[in-house]
């Protein structure tokens, strides 16, 4: 019961921000996407974490970090995964980041836009893109050396 109280009084939208993942996004992934293709997110570690938690994809979801973003554990967990030359799905919360990573794709197209709502108000938008033949130029791993 405590969670219900917290969720109802959540002024940060923390409990709502990814509420489209177990429903609409999971359904789209299950019915429309190729499970053999990795999903990446640029400069965002939360999206791959939520995909792993809610969708449990066959191929791991990965955060790709640019030089302007702090290193995250994905860089070390998956540094051996070769993405260069592969087709990928890109899921982003901010459409501005998509412009940065689109340069690394031979072909780039919007598959679907997902809306997350709270009480009929949109609190976040997620953009799912298809990236053909990822060049890998943006992925310089690891960005933090021990």
Positions of PLM-derived features:
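Short periplasmic/luminal acceptor-recognition loop of GT-C membrane glycosyltransferases, typified by
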Residues: 7, 11-71
């Amino acid at each position: 019961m405590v969670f219900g109280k917290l969720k109802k009084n959540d002024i940060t939208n923390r409990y709502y921000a990814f509420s489209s993942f177990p429903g609409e996004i999971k359904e789209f992934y299950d019915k429309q996407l190729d499970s053999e293709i990795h999903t990446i997110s640029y400069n965002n570690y939360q999206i791959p974490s939520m995909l792993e938690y809610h969708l449990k994809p066959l191929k791991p979801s990965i955060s790709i970090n640019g030089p302007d973003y702090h290193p995250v554990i994905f860089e070390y967990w998956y540094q051996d995964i070769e993405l260069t030359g592969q087709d990928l799905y890109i899921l982003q919360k901010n459409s501005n980041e998509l412009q940065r990573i689109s340069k690394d794709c031979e072909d780039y197209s919007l598959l679907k836009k997902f809306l997350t709502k709270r009480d009929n108000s949109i609190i976040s938008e997620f953009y799912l893109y298809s990236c053909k033949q990822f060049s890998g130029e943006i992925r310089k791993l690891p960005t933090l050396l021990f």
